[in-house]
Amino acid sequence: MPSNARVRMSDSETGGHAFPPGFSWPLWEQPRHFELGHILNSAVTDALPPRRVGALGVHHCGLWECDLRDQSLVWSGGAYDIFGLSRGSPITRQQAVAHYSEHSRARLENLRAYAIRRKRGFTLDVEIRAAAVGDRRWVRVIGAPVCEGDAVVRLHGVKLIV
């Protein structure tokens, strides 16, 4: 399939929500979709407190992973910063998705289920409420399944303030 090909999801797969083209992509395109996050979230940037990141803080990003066996999350420091949470504090998936606006949460859950079922990466812009600062912000969530054999066991990706 060419890299510019788009997947069309049925209403039953999207929960009736219309996803713009490009939200779902094949796993072989993962390096292209993750490149920005790896550039912006180097070990040096992630180790710095947000105030020391400077202008990069406006476009700060974080890495995330969700183990599908128990829904446990692993976040980099940048992911905590985006949500306005203390770095390293315990966070459950249920607590994390509570930060999403209702509309964004519904779209994320539908696209996440599709990505797991079809073994495809995804990109989605969502609105969240950052805890410490109390403001709403838009975040681009880029994710892809991690497979062991034919089974998807984890999702991992990048969150980027947009």
Predicted stretch roles:
Residues 2-30, 34-36, 80-156:
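PAS-family sensory domains
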Residues 38-41, 51, 149-162:
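Sensory coupling linkers of modular signal transduction proteins
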Residues 40-99, 138:
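PAS-family sensory domain signal
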Residues 68, 146, 162:
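Hydrophobic pocket-lining residues within nucleotide cofactor-binding pockets
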